[in-house]
Regions:
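Beta1-alpha1 glycine-rich phosphate/pyrophosphate-binding loop at the start
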Residues: 11-35, 64-76, 86-87, 114, ...
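Immediate flanking context of iron-sulfur cluster ligation sites
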Residues: 35-55, 79-105
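FAD-binding core/adjacent interface of flavoenzyme oxidoreductases
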Residues: 70, 94-96, 103-154, 170, ...
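Conserved beta-strand-loop-beta-strand element in the redox core of flavoprotein oxidoreductases
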Residues: 220-235, 280, 355-387
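FAD-site-proximal beta/loop scaffold in flavoenzymes
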Residues: 255-288, 372-449
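Long hydrophobic segments that form regular secondary structure
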Residues: 284-321, 388-394, 401-402, 420, ...
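A conserved FAD-binding loop/helix module that cradles the flavin
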Residues: 303, 445-472
Length: 472
């Protein structure tokens, strides 16, 4: 049925199915676990879309991808047209197709979700870019007329890459600065390879360079290059440095030996797997260890799934709410359970138990969910006399991240809120503009720790603000 007449019952006849490797196989490596679609499977899955009059999937997507339209093109075998359309709204579609929590975004909003299984939108999105790029498709910038304007982009993460993508398509030369030796930010160093193959990130860098984007790596603004130089030499500056400072639990024992922040653990492991130079002490090996990860978001899932691949003796994930109210991707919880992770729901850590300065366990109290908080999520309330200790040799803190803006922000009039988030929109209608009219920002620096796709949206929006500012 792939390229023949539309089957009105295709959503019934073709099941939602995204194949993945058997558990025993995927635990032996740090590579992606999902099998990609070939042309026929992609067309069959895309053909399940029933072309809703009001496409909720499109509106639930933070970048408002033209999902029904490119599903239709894939079903008809028009791959390059689908790639062109996909790249119109999303600067990193092959990445978002892999790591977006589609179950609570586009696929969660799919009309078929309740009774028949949502269209596998993420897998089709991944297929479109992967296959089109492999066949030689590239964004067409041949008709772009250079404006002579130059913009400095600080941070080569998703917000910075998205900003650069929009700018170069409009004739503005972006120069992207990053302190790391590879492009991608947390795409490269914070998200494990079993979710995102790093060659995918490197290919997107290559594409952007072919379009004309310039990268200057191993360069930290404020240390290697003064921010003042950027204000002098460029027509505008975009700040997309992300969030790297971890949120502490505020309970006793966090400074004990054997307790690690999630990002330090993940970055050290990813650099080790990739064979990139690093201090050996930054690599934390969990082989044979009893590991407890505190937190219920996607970063916690990355940590538990990394630990089982390192050969941990046992891995527990402790979260203070129930499974239904956890913030992470449901698919990632399923994967973690399949791989042997034990989840302890409704447990609030209150102390890391130590022996001679080293962690030996986590004391947690059981909770029950009470009234909603300001964000609408039910508050966990401790149950008296329910404390218990979970044995642990290693503890990973994965409570999220917050901005850690550099000191030079104050010097150049870049305002922040009480949580360190960069304030934008102070000067009127220009999207992403800070209190310093020449400086724009977006992504986690503005929102706080959030999704890759929302950072992409912010980077693209700020680029439009910059174009308006430059009168391009």
């Amino acid at each position: 049925m792939s390229k023949s007449a539309k089957n009105p019952f295709q959503f019934l006849d073709v099941p939602r199915r995204v194949r993945k490797q058997p558990v025993a196989q995927r635990l032996q490596h740090h590579q992606e676990i999902y099998h990609g679609f070939d042309a026929d499977r992609a067309a069959d899955q895309a053909g399940r879309c029933i072309a809703c009059g009001n496409p909720y999937c499109e509106w639930k997507c933070p970048v408002h991808n033209y999902i029904p339209d490119w599903l239709k093109l894939v079903a008809e075998g028009r791959l390059f047209e689908a790639a062109e359309l996909s790249n119109q709204t999303n600067s990193l579609p092959e990445i978002c197709g892999r790591i977006c929590p589609q179950d609570r975004l586009c696929e969660g909003a799919c009309t078929l979700n309740d009774g028949f299984g949502a269209v596998a939108i993420g897998a089709v999105e991944k297929y479109i870019s992967d296959t089109a790029l492999a066949q030689g498709w590239r964004p067409d910038v041949s008709r772009v007329v250079p404006t002579g304007k130059r913009v400095a982009v600080i941070g080569a993460g998703p917000a910075g890459l998205a900003c650069a993508d929009v700018l170069i398509r409009n004739g503005v030369q972006p120069v992207v600065f990053d302190r790391y030796d590879e492009v991608g930010g947390l795409l490269m160093f914070g998200i494990p390879g079993f979710k995102l193959d790093k060659e995918v990130v490197r290919l997107r860098r290559q594409i952007l360079e072919e379009m004309g984007v310039e990268f200057r790596l191993n360069t930290e603004i404020g240390r290697d290059l003064p921010f003042e130089d950027l204000l002098r030499d460029y027509d505008a500056v975009f700040l997309g440095m992300g969030t790297y400072r971890f949120v502490e639990g505020g309970f006793p024992g966090e400074q004990a030996r054997g307790v690690f922040p999630a990002l330090r653990y993940l970055i050290g492991n990813i650099r080790h797997v990739l064979g990139l130079p690093d201090n050996e002490e930054n690599y934390i090996d969990m082989a044979g260890q009893r590991v407890v990860v505190l937190g219920g978001g996607d970063t916690a899932m990355d940590c538990v799934r990394t630990a089982v691949r390192q050969g941990a003796a046992q891995v527990h994930c402790v979260y203070r709410r129930d499974e239904e109210n956890m913030p992470g991707s449901r698919a990632e919880v399923v994967n973690a359970k399949e791989e042997g992770v034990v989840f302890l729901w409704n447990r609030q850590p209150i102390e890391i138990v130590t022996d001679h300065g080293a962690a030996v366990g986590v004391k947690a109290v059981e909770t029950e969910l009470g009234p909603p908080d300001a964000n609408g999520r039910r508050r966990p309330q401790p149950i008296p006399e329910s404390e218990a200790v979970i044995d642990a040799d290693r503890v990973i803190i994965a409570f999220g991240f917050r901005p850690d803006p550099p000191e030079w922000f104050d010097t150049y009039g870049i305002e922040r809120d009480a949580n360190g988030r960069t304030l934008t929109g102070q000067n009127g209608d220009l999207r992403g503009q800070t209190a310093n009219p020449k400086v724009f920002s977006g992504g986690d620096m503005v929102r706080g720790s959030d999704l890759v796709v929302t950072a992409v949206f912010d980077g693209r929006e700020a680029a439009q603000g910059i174009l308006d500012y430059l009168d391009v």
